[in-house]
Design a protein with these regions (language model features):
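Eukaryote-biased recognition of intrinsically disordered, low-complexity regulatory segments
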Residues: 2-22
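Flexible glycine-/small-residue-rich
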Residues: 7, 66-68, 91
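Short secondary-structure capping/turn segments at boundaries of alpha-helices and beta-strands
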Residues: 11, 24, 48-50
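A generic structural signal for short beta-strands and their flanking turns/coil linkers
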Residues: 21, 58-60, 85
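Short, contiguous acidic and Ser/Thr-rich linear segments
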Residues: 22-32
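Ferredoxin-type iron-sulfur electron-transfer modules in oxidoreductases and energy-metabolism complexes
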Residues: 31-46, 85-180
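Local cysteine-cluster metal-coordination motifs and their immediate loop/turn environment
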Residues: 49-79, 143-161
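Extracellular/mature segments of secreted proteins
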Residues: 81-83
Length: 182
């Protein structure tokens, strides 16, 4: 059985406009991650461009739009996103495309930096590290896991349409962490 993969292609040095290119690939016998499928496609077409690094969902570098939903290719099982035998891969929306699935993250990082995502204290720094109680650490569960992949922010139309005014969900999460003073 074959899979039909529709891949967003754009090389500004060659292409006037982006286009979707269709690839046929034999459906793997066992379930694989979307990143594994991209690597298989790249073996046949070395011009395909995308980011990848850790393959563990830790670095966030392989964020992309997978069948209409933003996610990390390295931890997204192919079986969970296939529509029949079809898969569509696009770059994260709302950010400029550098090439194929690679976006320019400058706007995302600039918005994130606006909220000053670092420890801010009115008191003098201690001679040693600042201590955090286990109870305060527990309050962070579900809040500190953000890996800055931009999947949430680039899913948000307000981030696309008002990049100069709205910092986006990732930056708002960091701002919240600063506000709760843990």
């Amino acid at each position: 059985m074959e899979l039909s993969v529709s891949l967003y292609r754009y090389n500004p040095e060659q292409d006037k406009f982006p286009y979707m290119k269709n690839y046929k690939v034999k459906k793997p016998e066992k379930d694989i991650m979307v990143l594994d499928l991209l690597n298989m496609l790249k073996e046949d077409d070395a011009t395909i461009s995308y980011r990848r690094s850790c393959r563990e969902g830790v670095c966030g570098s392989d964020g992309m739009n997978i069948n209409g939903k933003n996610g990390l290719a390295c931890i997204t099982p192919l079986s969970e996103v296939l529509k029949g035998n079809k898969l569509e891969l696009r770059p994260l929306p709302g950010l400029p495309v550098i090439r194929d699935l690679i976006v320019d993250m400058t706007q995302f990082y600039e918005q994130y930096e606006k909220i000053k995502p670092f420890l801010q204290s009115d008191s003098e720094p201690p001679e040693q590290e600042r201590l955090q109680s286990p109870q305060d650490r527990d309050k962070l569960d579900g809040l500190y896991e953000c890996i800055l992949c931009a999947c949430c922010s680039t899913s948000c139309p307000s981030f696309w349409w008002n990049p100069d005014k709205f910092v986006g969900p990732a930056a708002l999460l960091q701002a919240y962490l600063s506000l709760i003073h843990i």
